[in-house]
Amino acid sequence: MSLLATPMPQAATASSSSSASAAASASGIPITANNNLPFEKDKIWYFSNDQLANSPSRRCGIKGDDELQYRQMTAYLIQEMGQRLQVSQLCINTAIVYMHRFYAFHSFTHFHRNSMASASLFLAAKVEEQPRKLEHVIRAANKCLPPTTEQNYAELAQELVFNENVLLQTLGFDVAIDHPHTHVVRTCQLVKACKDLAQTSYFLASNSLHLTSMCLQYRPTVVACFCIYLACKWSRWEIPQSTEGKHWFYYVDKTVSLDLLKQLTDEFIAIYEKSPARLKSKLNSIKAIAQGASNRTANSKDKPKEDWKITEMMKGYHSNITTPPELLNGNDSRDRDRDRERERERERDPSSLLPPPAMVPQQRRQDGGHQRSSSVSGVPGSSSSSSSSSHKMPNYPGGMPPDAHTDHKSKQPGYNNRMPSSHQRSSSSGLGSSGSGSQRSSSSSSSSSQQPGRPSMPVDYHKSSRGMPPVGVGMPPHGSHKMTSGSKPQQPQQQPVPHPSASNSSASGMSSKDKSQSNKMYPNAPPPYSNSAPQNPLMSRGGYPGASNGSQPPPPAGYGGHRSKSGSTVHGMPPFEQQLPYSQSQSYGHMQQQPVPQSQQQQMPPEASQHSLQSKNSLFSPEWPDIKKEPMSQSQPQPFNGLLPPPAPPGHDYKLNSHPRDKESPKKERLTPTKKDKHRPVMPPVGSGNSSSGSGSSKPMLPPHKKQIPHGGDLLTNPGESGSLKRPNEISGSQYGLNKLDEIDNSNMPREKLRKLDTTTGLPTYPNYEEKHTPLNMSNGIETTPDLVRSLLKESLCPSNASLLKPDALTMPGLKPPAELLEPMPAPATIKKEQGITPMTSLASGPAPMDLEVPTKQAGEIKEESSSKSEKKKKKDKHKHKEKDKSKDKTEKEERKKHKKDKQKDRSGSGGSKDSSLPNEPLKMVIKNPNGSLQAGASAPIKLKISKNKVEPNNYSAAAGLPGAIGYGLPPTTATTTSASIGAAAPVLPPYGAGGGGYSSSGGSSSGGSSKKKHSDRDRDKESKKNKSQDYAKYNGAGGGIFNPLGGAGAAPNMSGGMGAPMSTAVPPSMLLAPTGAVPPSAAGLAPPPMPVYNKK
């Protein structure tokens, strides 16, 4: 189409092009009179007043005031469309400049402003690296404009492409735009301006684009000086001269003088006086903000009028700025007023020109509250995009469906009112997560939402928005579009949900996708998901803000709305990924939110993947395994907040769950999953629950919650647990990781789904996978089709699994490791009650994912309870499941062997980052040491339960085939990761790695060797454990350890080594050091059996 359209601009617009050339010649495009031109090439874009007075529109009979009004209406249409498309404010500003420059050479009578608004935004989105689909741009325009003529989509698309070509030619392909906002922020920092002054200056910079044609007359630095100068006048703030006796603006632009600033101020005030009432109210509100809190309070009267305006400006420019809840409530009257104004404008407008509906719709939507939010999202700050996506996504979720949008709008008022502050906060916070800069932005946004009366726009908010956020934001919105269509159904549900989480989820939905994309861009960016999770106390992942990961809640608390941000950072999950899942989990229902805390890392990523799947499954799926590896290493260090969550992200990378076997093994009945399932859930869940953050192996950093197993109601309480159930596979560490990685890859399902799929899929929850969220439709055999995902999500939301959450659930056969493993490892059941221990215990008692009910009991209490309870439960579980496990193990062993061999090969190639190449069967390590014990230095012995399948030749063959690469090579790799994150533990890991390698090839012998190393390394391990009880995530390296426990004292060290040093790090020194004999049978129940297990091999 572009080819067809390209010639047309010349032919079809012969008159327009001639007029353009005439305008150029008439206006003397190169204007020498202007002193503000930094470079000759820029002269063409700056015009004198005389030249502007003789513009093409004027020559066509349009009055000066009318032309200015058209420019203003077009700018607001672009603003609204940009917010709907969830592009950054930077992108919107660029589109507005394109529009101003275009109409300096063309008449409004030749090119309708609504058409050029779409073309400008379409082009600016590409230029600012936030491309939007033609279809989405057209839909956004149709939503923002009143229904005029029902044009064919093909016609609209061709017209847009044609107009884009005309625009590009008019601009001479000079598409790089410098904005005054950058200079405003920089100058405010230079003069150390107060927050109000900085915010007002920033607003004025946006207003100069929306209300005036200053961008055609003065360079950005001059406009920035004017904005600060006027803000100083309004706020009665005086910027003193420098020590050199020069005015502050001299340091911004040497050509600026006080006279010029006064002239610009007069011009701006004159335009302000002429502007419609709605614009005046907006400026009044800005002025009030500048004048201080007292004025702000008084300004509340104006807020209804300015409501959409300031919020719009703020949304447009600051994602942080969310409409205050009170503003959201008074939308109806304002909407009516705006409708009347729009009618008047239509009457005034020439019949040829469409009314400026763009502005009105904007007002309305903003009034709706969602629109405001979305406009915020439009803000350059990534955070804004998130917030807008939360509000806006629902509006524009598919972005496309007008119905959805309308519905959302209608629901928005009540919806926003219910949880306006938390929702806004979460949305802004989500945005903040998009980038580090965004975080600042989101914190400001959270503060703004907290202080509805006054939009908080920290000076840095622009930076954040302009820096990372645009890309992340822009990208996310785009992703959102794709994903929104998939998640649309969910979003509507979210809207109705009174929970802030619902609102958050919608924000997340949009935001999550953005983040997932952004995450790719910023793999190391702080995880946004946590941001969304903690932001709303309700939303905080398990429904308990503080409980979610222990680590997560505290950071959020500091931020208020941003809490989740810090939490996410702690988790180390990719911000996008995390946010994504989070929002989706919200969509699923608050139930998922409950699990969210634990799944924040796990579930969110899965959700992110789900979103991705919905939007584009293939986008992430191929990369999942690699991504997992990378993110794990990256996130492991990141997560170490002293909280278990940090290691969890690495676990995600491992995606132990993703092994095909897990998929194969029915995980739906989590309680009675196959031995595989039992093993996987047991180890990983525990580790994931409390130790997930502690151990990299434990993949997700699930807050200690009730069992994750119940996908339904209880998930909320112990989302971490559900994560841990799946984690058992992951925790089993590397072996699981290998097997489950495939499965997870196959089913990158949100954690909620995973929980249900847990039975079915096993570790889908871990798919999240820090850096890249592969779509849920991983190719490993788990179906990730949107329908399947939806059904899974629904199931996960169901409280039917609540019973599973109960501690007894841990004892369920499905969760338990094979009988052989159970004998050595009676602890699994105990883990349940060792909630405090759960971080370690959950890893140790891999078989008892249910037991992962990881309450927030203190480590000491948990240790005691866990030791006694875990032993009892383990014994019971062993007897109950021995027979089942044995039969299951036999069949699964063969499958696992195959998968393990393949995976081990891949992993060995991958550099051992995935020690999980060991047997698919989750090595169940029952580590009785609670977090406290880890911290204390491994007071408790480590219990590793290794299913026979794992010990079997399958594992060995895989390990043996790759012993050097996996056993030894991986341990070092893991050790490296561990060393970075764990510190003292790192030294221990390499030896363990060696031991692990040995164990994989020759379980018993290597156990002995590793046991020696254990003793030598115990001190190291103790120190590392003390320092980082959260390193459990590294239990991924526990694969070897598991065998060793079976094999003997060396088991613990081997675990860490075989599983990839992380295990060793995670395992308390005592656990690692304890020889098989040393490991109390009660604690491990593994010491005596380990050797037999190897023999079974």
UniProtKB/Swiss-Prot annotation:
GO MF terms listed in the record are:
cyclin-dependent protein serine/threonine kinase activator activity; cyclin-dependent protein serine/threonine kinase regulator activity
Q: Which residues carry this modification: Phosphoserine?
A: S916
UniProt-listed CDD domains = CYCLIN_CCNT_rpt1, CYCLIN_CCNT_rpt2
Keyword Coiled coil in record: no
Disulphide bonds in the chain: none
Where are the stretches annotated Disordered?
319-782, 804-936, 985-1097
Q: What does this protein do?
A: Regulatory subunit of the cyclin-dependent kinase pair (CDK9/cyclin T) complex, also called positive transcription elongation factor B (P-TEFb), which is proposed to facilitate the transition from abortive to production elongation by phosphorylating the CTD (carboxy-terminal domain) of the large subunit of RNA polymerase II (RNAP II).
The name under which this protein is listed is Cyclin-T
Q: Which organism is it from?
A: Drosophila melanogaster
